[in-house]
Every structure is written in C-alpha cells, then in structure tokens.
UniProtKB/Swiss-Prot annotation:
Gene: MYOB3
Species of provenance: Arabidopsis thaliana
Binding partners and assembly: Interacts with myosin XI-K.
Gene knockout outcome: No visible phenotype. Myob1, myob2 and myob3 triple mutant has a significant height reduction and a delayed flowering. Myob1, myob2, myob3 and myob4 quadruple mutant has a significant height reduction, a reduced rosette diameter and a delayed flowering.
Listed GO CC annotations: membrane
UniProt feature, compositional bias: Basic and acidic residues: 238-251, 596-605
Location in the cell: Membrane
Lipid bilayer topology: Single-pass membrane protein
Name of protein: Myosin-binding protein 3
C-alpha cells in the first residue's frame, strides 16, 4: 500500500515525465539491490560449501518478523516467489522417508505416500530413491464376487459384493486375503456418478483406438467360480486389434446358440452356468475396463492428442474409451435393476434363463446401437478430417506454386542483374581504355610542348646573340657609318619583326593585313631613301664628270642609252670593279700619293659607300616584296583549314632553320674578319 500511495501522490503532484524518470531511477536502484542480494547469496552458498557447513535456506533470513509486529503485515512465501518458481515448486513432492524434494510424476509407492498415485506407476526410476518403478508393474487385483459364488469366502446375505485386495508382495507366500463388503447401492451410486461425469465431459476425436486385453482367472476351481481380473501390466498386455463388427457377430451368435440350447435341449444347470460365464467372458474380454485403467488411458490419450494434433478440439480415443466405460456401467446398472442382488448376471439367484438371454440380447442391441452411433460420429469426424486434409493439401499446393513463381522471378531478376553487371564491366573496360589513350595523348602533347619550349628558348638565345653581334658591329664602325649602322639595325629589327609576324600569322590570322600595310609603308620609306641616295649619286657623278669628262661620260651615256630600262642598282654594280681596283691601288700606293690626289680618293670612297648602301636598300626592298607575296600566300592557305595551318607550321620551321644558318654564317665571317 505504501508503494501505491507513493505512486498516487507522485502522479498527482508532478507531471508524467517526472513520474517516468523517478520510476526509472527506482527500478535501476532496485536492480542494483537485487544484484547485491544475488552477490551475497552466491557468496554465502560458496562459503558454506567451501568450509563444509550446512546450506542456509534462502527464505529463512527474513527481518519482517522483527520489524513487523502484526502477522498480517508480514510477507508470505507466495509474495516472495515468482510464477516460474512457484510452478517449479508445485511440480515437486516431498519424500518424508528420505527428506528430499523430487518430481511427483516419477515417485515410487514408498516415496509418494499416497495410494491414489500408485496407479500412475510406469517404467523408469524413482526421482527420490532411484528405485526401479518396474518392481510393481500392475496394481492389486480387484475381485468381484456374487452372493452365490462367494459362499466359501463368506459373503453377505443381503446380496452385497465382496472386494478382495490381493497384494503382489504377499502373493505366493501364504498370503492373507483382506475382505471388505459393500452394499449394492454403493455401486449404483458409483454408476450414476459415472453417467453424470460422462455427460459433462467432452469427447476428443482421433483416428485409431488401441484395444486393451483383459484376462480372467479362476479363483476357486472347486466351486466353479470365475472372477474378472483386470491386469494393467505392460508386459502382460495383449495388444490385438479386432473389429467391432466381428465382436458383435460373435456375441450375437453366442447368445443365440446359448438360447437354443436352453430352449430345446434343457441342458443341466451346470452347463447353463458355464455358458453364461463364457458369454460374460467374451463380452467383458473386449468391453470391461476398470476405472483406474480408463482414467490412465484417458490421460495418456489426451497427452498424445495434444502432441499430435494440438488444433483438433476432440479425440476419438477418449470418446471411444468413455463410450466403453459407459456401456460397462450400463451392464452393471441393468443387472442391479433386475432386483436379484447380482452385479454381473441375475440367473444365479434362480431366475429364468430365457429372461436372462433376453436381457443379454437387449444389452447387445444397446451396445450395437451405441457402436453404430459411435461409427457414425467417427465417419463424420473422418469426413471432416478428410475435408480439412484436402484443404490443407490445396493450400500447400498453392503455396508451392507461389513459391515456384517467386523462385522463377528471383532467377529472372538475378539473370538481369548479372547481364547488367556484364554490361557495366564492358563499359568500365572501354572507359579504362579511353583513359589510357587520353593519358598517352596527354604525355605525347607534354613531350611536344617541352620540345617546343626548348626550341623557343633556342631561338630566343640565337636572336639575342644576333642582336649582340649587330650591336658590336655598330660600335666598331666609325661615326661616318652611323647611317649605315642604323639601316642595318632597322634591317635586323625588320628580320625579327618578320619572324614574329610569321609566328603571329600562324596563331593570329587577323594580324596579317596589318603586317601587309606595314610592309607597304616600309617599302615607301625605302623607296624614298633610294631616291635620296640616287640624287646624291647623281650629284657626285656630275662633279666627277666636270673634273674628268672623258672617263665617266661614255660609261654613263652607254648605260643611259643602251640600258635605259636598268635601274640605278645595276649601274652601281657595274661601277664596283672600278671602285675595287681603285681601292687596291690606293692601299698599295697610299703613302706615295701626292696631296693633290687625297681629295679624289675621299670622293671615291664616298661613292663606294653610297653604292653599297644603294645595293643593300635594293636587296631589302626585294626581300620585303618576297615576304609580302609569302604572307599573301599564307593568308590564302590559312583560309583552307587545318591543312593550311600545318603547311604554315612547316614553312615557319624551314624559315627558322634558314635564319639560323644565315646567322651562323655571318658570325663566322665576322670572326674571320676580326682575326
């Protein structure tokens, strides 16, 4: 109650999350205490076992006796045990003889201490004393005696029955018979109680029924009495399967034969008694069961049915056993209702044998009707089981078909996935090949780029060397040759510009037009320079003609008359041999020349310089014209596409090679001249 009060107060005063957190903490704390308790319990058990002490009961050390004064507030054993351990303890029994706890289902007669459990003894060993349970394979004999048959045994005069219990332990060693007499009303009450129980219980249905053998033994041969002995031993049990139709036919034939013998032949009383006894022997051999046997078989059948068919609500064997039990009780009740005081048959009191036969026939008919009803119920159950089996088989076949379809679909999807995987593998291989190819192309381009870089560096170094050489040449010249050096510088710059223009022509085609216009401008400038030089040359020739008209007038007239279409360059070239001869003469006899001739020599040298300049200008002009035509051709070829660019690249490479050759030649010439 304290815990409930605490829970109610906590739930009222706080919110739900706080309650959950508090109880979570309390559960963890409880688990910790349980762990400590189990740890100390384990330590106590190990301590006692290690030192050989007596084990302590786990339920004895309780402090509620000290803290709780009132007994109703103390904890009981039921509250301290869980359901699993209570069920485990409930399945055990205490043996007072040996002082042990053992399974109650497997106890011998000495350990169980209960007479009702002796009928459940079977094969195996006792769970308490390990004694074999097969030492007493069947229970005590139950002997049913009528008032007439039991005279030698001292039965009662009021027609009561005498029950004799024969113990197997005393059998064969001068045993004593313990007798107890019961009135007939006792058995009537038992029969009525059995009927009520049969009506209240529900039968369970299964497919086959085992037959149990019953044995009859004679107790006293002198009196000619026969007793019904029920033997439940597994070793003496005769398991024979006989159909009910044959039994009914045998019973009917025996009854009919016996009736005819009684009516026609009127045989002796002893023969009549023997026939009735045989008839009872045949009937009770297949139908008569004791109460303990039927209960045992019902329990066994229920367990077997639960194991084999847990979903079936009824069992054939249980119903069949109940029917047989009911028929056996009806036989006893019919015999008792006759009022002759006999349990088995009524003719032993001096009744009419025909009446007995009629009663037996009625009994047989009742049994046959009961058997027919039973067979009808069996057929219904069989048909129901057949229908359920057919439905189950149909369901199984449908499930198998669905399983096959699912397997086929799974295989199809698996094939599709495998094919897709193959396609993916092929695509990956192609991509790998492409990647390798691209890598190779990339490496090749990198190599070409390195080659081009090396060539560019080489060309730059050559251009620098050329510029250095030109600068050195310019510094070595005199002040008078400044103009020539400037022109040479311009020519070198123009050469460099040409190389750059050719490169730009390959890379940038839009610059070609501008370069052509620049060439035209340079051409015009060069033509102007040529005109100036020609004018100077003409003035110088006029002066010379005035001084020495005999030599140059003829040559000039021939040049002007015979070669009117020639340019000033051809005229200058024609004068070169004379100028060279004059230079040689001047070098050889420079010291011996008179002072009057120094002026003439200076004028001749100036003429030679002018002629050289004119020749160089004309050469540059021709080069510019050729370069202009080349650029025009390059522009026309560049318009053709990739082939034109390839051709331009090849031409540019050849031009560079030629330029390097020219530079090397000029450098060698300069070195030789300096030497």
């Amino acid at each position: 109650m304290a815990a409930n009060n605490f829970a109610t107060k906590l739930s009222r005063n706080t919110n739900r999350i706080t309650v959950i957190l508090v109880y979570a903490f309390l559960e963890w704390l409880l688990m910790f205490f349980i762990f400590l308790n189990s740890f100390f319990t384990y330590f106590i058990v190990k301590f006692a076992s290690f030192f050989g002490l007596k084990q302590v009961c786990l339920l004895c050390p309780k402090l509620d006796r000290i803290f709780e004064r009132k007994p109703e507030n103390r904890f009981t054993y039921k509250e301290l045990l869980c359901q699993n351990h209570i069920a485990e303890l409930a399945s055990l029994s205490f043996c007072r003889t040996h002082g042990k706890l053992s399974e109650s289902a497997n106890l011998c007669s000495d350990c169980s201490n209960r007479e009702e459990e002796q009928s459940n003894i079977g094969l195996g060993f006792c769970t308490c004393c390990q004694k074999s349970l097969a030492d007493k394979p069947y229970p005590n004999y139950l002997l049913l005696k009528s008032s007439i048959w039991g005279k030698t045994l001292g039965d009662r005069e009021d027609g009561g029955l005498i029950l004799e219990m024969i113990d197997d332990d005393k059998f064969g060693d001068g045993f004593e018979i313990d007798r107890e007499s019961y009135p007939l009303g006792f058995f009537r009450d038992k029969a009525e109680e059995g009927k009520k129980q049969d009506q209240q219980q529900n039968g369970e249905v299964i497919s086959d029924v085992e037959s149990y053998g019953l044995s009859l033994r004679e107790v006293s041969e002198e009196d000619g009495l026969r007793s019904i002995i029920s033997n439940n031993s597994p070793g003496n049990e005769a398991k024979s399967r006989v159909s009910e139709d044959e039994q009914r036919n045998d019973d009917t034939s025996n009854v009919a034969t016996y009736g005819e013998d009684q009516i026609s032949g009127r045989v002796e009383e002893k023969e009549e008694e023997t026939g009735v006894a045989d008839l009872l022997y045949d009937q009770f051999e297949s139908k008569n069961f004791t109460g303990s046997q039927i209960e045992e078989e019902e329990e066994d059948r229920e367990e077997t049915t639960k194991e084999l068919d847990p979903e079936t609500p009824t069992s054939v064997s249980t119903l069949f056993n109940k029917k047989l039990h009911f028929l056996a009780r009806n036989e006893y009740a019919a015999a008792e209702d006759a009022g002759d005081g006999n349990v088995l048959v009524s003719e032993m009191d001096g009744g009419d044998p025909l009446r007995t036969i009629e009663r037996l026939r009625e009994t047989v008919r009742a049994e046959q009707e009961a058997l027919r009803d039973l067979y009808a119920e069996l057929e219904e159950e069989r048909s129901a089981s057949a229908i359920s089996a057919n439905q189950t088989m149909a369901m199984i076949t449908r499930l198998q078909e669905e399983k096959a379809k699912v397997q086929m679909e799974a295989l199809q999807y698996q094939r599709m996935m495998e094919e897709q995987a193959e396609y993916d593998q092929e695509a990956l291989q192609l991509l790998n090949h492409l990647m390798v190819k691209r890598e190779k192309e990339k490496e090749q381009l990198q190599r070409e780029l390195e080659v081009y870089r090396a060539k560019v560096l080489e060309y730059e170094s050559k251009a620098k060397n050329k510029i250095i050489v030109v600068e050195n040449d310019c510094e070595a010249d005199d002040d008078d040759k400044e103009e020539e050096n400037r022109e040479e510088d311009n020519s070198s710059e123009m050469d460099v510009d040409l190389e750059k223009i050719t490169l730009d022509c390959v890379q940038h085609m839009s610059m070609l037009g501008e370069s052509l216009s620049e060439f035209e401008e340079e051409r015009l400038v060069i033509l102007d320079q040529l005109k100036v030089l020609e004018d100077r040359l003409v003035t110088m020739q006029d002066k010379e003609s005035a001084e020495d008209p005999g030599e140059f007038s003829n040559s000039y007239e021939e040049a002007s008359n015979g070669h009117g279409g020639l340019t000033m360059a051809s005229m200058a070239k024609s004068l070169l041999p004379l100028l060279d001869a004059a230079e040689n003469e001047s070098e050889d006899g420079s010291q011996g020349l008179p002072e009057s001739d120094e002026k003439n020599f200076g004028s001749d040298s100036e003429k030679l310089e002018i002629i050289k300049q004119v020749d160089s200008v004309y050469e540059r002009l021709q080069e510019l014209e050729t370069d202009g035509e080349f650029l025009k051709n390059c522009m026309s070829s560049a318009k053709k596409g990739d082939k034109g660019t390839d051709i331009l690249k090849d031409i540019l490479q050849h031009l560079r090679d030629l330029r390097t050759i020219e530079l090397t030649n000029t450098i060698e010439n300069q070195t030789t001249q300096e030497e």
